[in-house]
């Protein structure tokens, strides 16, 4: 079989890689609208616990979520200097996700992705993990960004942003 046929057998996926604490995660680049430095976050009283606050991104108010909190990871008192906000679109709503670092954007082949390991017992966790990419010694957890937040949580985040924008 010629090499060109082998190459076309597996689709390449472009991923935005980010870190939360000691873990590496990836999301398909098509879900990412932009990556921004952490802007001044306005904390909103009585906002749902998963919402860190809102930011003004070039005139548009976006709800920002602490992804570490959403995943039940240890929260830091201060964000690292490398922290970024990944702006995504979920259920037709733009949201910001605070992550510790966005070191790279990579291309991988679908054949490098393995199903979610059985060791992950929680159905909630399995619900938003698409699989695991093995890149040498690195394991990158691939997220299904549409399932990280429920539709109800996305609606709540959109309401918070609209109240502030009004």
Task: Tell me what each language-model feature is.
Residues 1-166:
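An acidic, low-aromatic, low-complexity terminal/linker signal
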